Amino acid sequence: MRTTGFYAKYGLYDTTAREDSTLTTAYNQSFGDISKAKEDISAPDYGTLEQDYFLLDGTHPEMPDNPDDVVFFSSEMSGADGTFTENPLLIILFTENHTSACLTFHFVGDHPLEMKIRWVDGSGNYIEYASYEVDSNKFVAWKQVENYRRLEIEFTRAMPYRYVKFRYIEYGTDIICGVDGYPVKEAKLVEECDPISNKIAINKLTFKLIDEKNDFDIGNMSGIHKVFQSGQKVMAYETINGEAQLLGAFFLDSYSTTKNISTISLVDYKGLLSKHTFRGGKVYTGEPAGEVIDQIMAAAGITAYTVDEATRAAPLYGWLKIQDCRKTLREVLFACGSVIDSSRSETVNIYKPSRVIHTTIQRSRKFSTTPKNQSYISDVAVKFPVYSLDEESKEIFKSTYVPGIYTVDLSSPSAEMTITGGTITEQTNNYVTFTVAEEGEVVISGRKYSKEDLTVTASVEKVDAGESRETKSFTCTVLNASQAADRAQAILDYYDLRLNLKIKFLNEGDKVVDWAEVFNANRKFGSYVAGIEKMTTDLTGGYISTAELRGYYKLVEDFYYTGEIIAGEEFGEM
């Protein structure tokens, strides 16, 4: 019997504290290097002369004369009662304020038993203090503290005759929601990908967890919700018979709590694109799409992405105005005939889709199948602009300004701008930045681009019997005539796939964009071949998906005779 489960791993970290930290101590052995505590280096548990420390079975290597993997090895060994003559002390300094819900310590060998931590603000005032009983080599010291500039970590007791051996600190920890973590009441994943890239749909993950201790309640002033940051990364997984399958990387969008039930809403990489503005557009005359995609991703702060070579090489013609990164990327991908997808991946991937079958949905996995025909489309029209630079310079705008630095965004592209009453410091086709030394009228002039809209239409040769002509229209701002014709024909071919399927089935890693062979419940009538365009998955109710697909009917004729299989004979139980 199949068993499933869901969990999300949330990195509850102050993401800038490690790089901003400087660790110091006066209690380290000469061979220890405390600066390496900023790195998660592998440190073996060396055999030492601590009393009754290790067996002579080869599990503890001999320490070399000059080890390069020892971070902190206290200068003093604990006594018979586990205390120290002078407690080992670590001090961590920061140049900026930091906030964390906890500190995670990584020790080597026998961990200390007790420690104290003091949090200090930028003025030298102690803002929090806590004592901890350490119970593992990876120990999480929970304490929600805001705006600290200094940490003082004092080790007060260990096992008898032991050194404190510390190797790494993290300014936070992973929070698990679901399997082996906070219990999740329900979880739903909605994934969508438009194969013609007329829109970039956002994948959304929503789950409700049972918050017995009010850790996520905004009213709890010491709750871990205080370190929630919009855009923090969450890795989501589904387990099938104990084996974890990656659902994707998601980012915190919003959360709320009602009666100990916290609702966490997350978006994928495509959702991040909507939160950032792309200002680097211009008038393009054949520049490769890959360069522009790199600029869009940089503007959105996304580094984990791939772009296939065919998409990278596609030329762009037209203009990209100032707008959010998702809308900008839609223009580029529509022109390229490429899609963007992040499902079942740690990265976001951009590529030209194909109709290669990646998965098979057998009868044994299906609960229901509802086929229907989509509306008939006979014509596809694609409108695109053609820009030409005017010969003469004209006034673009004028206004009165007091001394200062200003940036003016343009509603239409211009070039070769000049100014009276100020000094231009930066200009692009989309905006101009200038400085004003004295109050007065500022006039910006330049050569404007004239625009002419053209439309290319792809049509079927003959309208199907009983149908009438129906046109679908699209617009793209970075196409030329040849590309518009190719895109119109490709979209028309897509609309020729009129079969729409709605199926409910047991998911085994199936994802949007993939093409699937869906077996018909009636074995006499072949199967369906279709691309998964949208899928909603119940992550806590059996990993059951409801998907919408578009494709065609694969008819299996009875008029074949191949090998030992004859007409009418079953050719495999699916």
Can you name each region flagged by the protein language model?
Residues 294, 326-334:
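Solvent-exposed, polar/charged alpha-helical surfaces in well-ordered, non-transmembrane soluble domains
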Residues 1-283, 334-335, 391-449, 496-504, ...:
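Assembly/oligomerization scaffold segments
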Residues 353-359, 440-442, 446-452, 520-557:
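C-terminal, active-site-flanking charged/polar segments
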Residues 182-208, 300, 463-496:
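Short beta-strand/loop turn elements enriched in aromatics
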Residues 337-359:
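Extended amphipathic alpha-helical segments with heptad-repeat/coiled-coil character used for oligomerization
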Residues 441-471:
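C-terminal, non-catalytic macromolecule-binding modules
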